[in-house]
Amino acid sequence: MKGLILVGGYGTRLRPLTLSVPKPLVEFCNRPMILHQIEALAEAGVTDIVLAVNYRPEVMVDTLKKYEKEYGVNITFSVETEPLGTAGPLKLAEKILKKDNSPFFVLNSDVICEYPFKELAEFHKSHGGKGTIVATKVDEPSKYGVIVHDLGTPNLIDRFVEKPKEFVGNRINAGLYILNPEVIDLIEMKPTSIETETFPKLVNEKSLYTFDLEGFWMDVGQPKDFLAGTGLYLQSLSRRHPEKLSTGSNIVSNAIIDPTAKISPDAKIGPDVVIGPNCVIGSGVRIVRSVLLKNCVVKENSLIKDTIVGWDSTIGRWCRLEGCAVLGHDVAVKDEVYVNGAKVLPHKSISANVPSEAIIM
């Protein structure tokens, strides 16, 4: 089987982290974000994976090529000279995706969930249509494009309603698909949208179905969702693979701590915390709902809450970081500084309080 991951471009929503590293290589729960997807595809029997990229592919090649042998897959980079949207990349990779008659998976690189690829393939085969969209239920459907089903045929899509003012359903597109190769014939070689241009054609043919996603789902392409998705992922691990979570007397609940990290015995960690390799956490530190990427130092008695701390950053003594603050690579926060919701660009030093949302350049 084959799969295409829509990697895309600059990752602007996840800045300042993506100023230093392409978004797919930003670590989510201590592994590059895209590796979660490559592993799930490989486990479902996918042997050919296409990465559709238009930004810094050379940076990703060396990192991702080493996963080919590990997971027994062929990884091909399909490089766009201009951004082609969400459908154009399928046309660009037509030669690979149409090399046989088997269907192929498509997924957005920002999506983290309990990937149901095996079940999705079986369901797609059973209904005989040309495409299947994975759908997830949301509490506030008025914020999204909602899927409306045909009343006479289970799971057959009748139409899409963008941000409905009245309730028409609560299922939305989860950014995971399986499509037959002939769907590529509906796509032109230009920037185009699979959601607004390709899928409506399949709906008109009565050939597009939904598969309901069980478990959590999150688009982690921006900081607040990255943190929320981390919490959901850890919650899922606690239910399905509790052995993968870190344990200890100073861990409140649901944390992943790299074995190389050094944590003071009287620091308190959790819930919903990820600490990367070679981090050093001092005495009296409290970390809640936060992610620390590799080589970070947090000195004594600081509080880190709802924050992403970028690689090689240092937090001084008696600091308080909160409010979805994001520190880029190699940021230094001096002692006794309060940071609330700031986005701090790489290599900056902060010695004064930042009491409200700001971009520190």
Swiss-Prot record:
Highest taxon of source: Eukaryota
Record GO cellular component, one term: cytoplasm
Pathway: Nucleotide-sugar biosynthesis; GDP-alpha-D-mannose biosynthesis; GDP-alpha-D-mannose from alpha-D-mannose 1-phosphate (GTP route): step 1/1
Localisation per UniProt entry: Cytoplasm
GO process annotations (BP): GDP-mannose biosynthetic process
GO molecular function: GTP binding; mannose-1-phosphate guanylyltransferase (GTP) activity
Keywords: Cell cycle, Cytoplasm, GTP-binding, Nucleotide-binding, Nucleotidyltransferase, Transferase
SUPFAM superfamilies linked to this entry: Nucleotide-diphospho-sugar transferases
InterPro entries (alphabetical): GMPPB_C, GMPPB_N, Mannose-1P_guanyltransferase, NTP_transferase_dom, Nucleotide-diphossugar_trans
Signal sequence residues: none
Keyword Nucleotide-binding: yes
EC number per UniProt: 2.7.7.13
PROSITE patterns: HEXAPEP_TRANSFERASES
Catalysed reactions listed for this entry: alpha-D-mannose 1-phosphate + GTP + H(+) = GDP-alpha-D-mannose + diphosphate
Entry's family note: Belongs to the transferase hexapeptide repeat family.
Stated role: Involved in cell wall synthesis where it is required for glycosylation. Involved in cell cycle progression through cell-size checkpoint.
Protein name: Mannose-1-phosphate guanyltransferase 2
Organism for this UniProt entry: Candida glabrata (strain ATCC 2001 / BCRC 20586 / JCM 3761 / NBRC 0622 / NRRL Y-65 / CBS 138) (Yeast)
Gene that this polypeptide is encoded by: MPG1
